[in-house]
Amino acid sequence: MAEAAQQDGEIGEVREAHRFDVKRLEAYCREAVEGFSGTLDVRQFSGGQSNPTFLLTEEGPRGLKRYVMRKKPPGVLLASAHQIDREYRVMKALAETDVPVPHMYALCEDDSIIGTSFYVMEYLEGRVFRESTMPGSSEAERRAIYSNLAENLARLHKVDYEKVGLGDFGKPGNYFERQIGRWIKQYRGAQTTDIPSMEELIKYLPEHIPDEQSVTIAHGDYRLGNTMFHPTEPHMIAVLDWELCTIGHPLADVAYNCMYDLLGVAGGVGPIDRTKTPGIPTDKEFAAEYCRHAGRDGIEDWNFYLAFSMFRLASISQGVYKRGLDGNASSERAMTLGDACRNLADHAWEILQRKD
């Protein structure tokens, strides 16, 4: 069986930049979290580059109970980033659907409690696969897990977002126009050097947006490492990390997942050797599996969607790196991302030159 992290990565001491008054958090939980009546031990998960995530362990009359807390990072933040209230809202809205999400306990937008907004959610026992190749897994398990990954993405995109109360969750207009503009702006705000391929993408992408305009809930960061699977079985028990969720285009999610997990261009993974890790689909095989579950008849303009996903992640990576330079990053890995933006942009521009 593959080794995998629980909930959101390895657990350690709270980093100095993210420390807060635990007693004030305890007092808040007694008022806002149903059944809470004990004292808290707080540890920090090492996973995640955006919003700091913590393991809360309550010790009280009912014994030990665990929760997970996510909060905004400290420091001056980009206006459209780290919107944890959106994470909380979308997971709460999806609670009654067939999309697996943790239970939401409380959202606090009062900065006086621990210094920033935060929310408390259910702690789940399961497997989070940090490596898309799933070392130690069998071919059958890899195949089953990636199939379930595609199936649950299709489930998300089938949710009627207006019926679950998310009709105002995204802005009107063309999703890709909106997103390209957003990530250009965020890249400019975090830019530290000139990257020719980023400039090419900034010119190309707005002029080549596909005509097809489906509208669904779009997770925004859907990939294997942001989901949790049953401890022993190949079925998903939670989709995590909803910070980038909006009302958008479903194929942005499909392409992002393929870019991140299956093409090996994110995080320095490199090309996947499927002879050594059988059972992992190619990007086109995953897209076909998604289409089967979604009732969709294929995907046109696939290279645009892939390139957009790489451009978007390039901008995100540059923002994380800039926060690291400024001392505000939520993870120690931030300073390793200095070349990530350039590498992703180069790959995106290369894909757009292809004729397939």
Model-derived segments and their meaning:
Residues 217-219, 224:
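Catalytic-loop of the protein kinase fold
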Residues 2-36:
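Juxta-kinase regulatory segment immediately upstream of eukaryotic protein kinase catalytic domains
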Residues 104-107, 225, 300:
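Conserved beta-strand->loop/alpha-helix structural units within folded catalytic cores of enzymes
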Residues 298-299, 315-356:
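Helical subdomain adjoining the active site within ATP-dependent kinase catalytic cores
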Residues 228-256:
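Catalytic activation segment of kinase domains across protein kinase-like and atypical kinase folds
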Residues 39-217, 230-233:
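ATP-binding pocket architecture of kinase catalytic cores
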Residues 170-171, 297-309:
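All-alpha amphipathic helical-bundle segments outside canonical DNA-binding/catalytic cores
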Residues 252-294, 308-326:
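Active-site activation/catalytic loop segments of kinase-like enzymes and analogous catalytic loops
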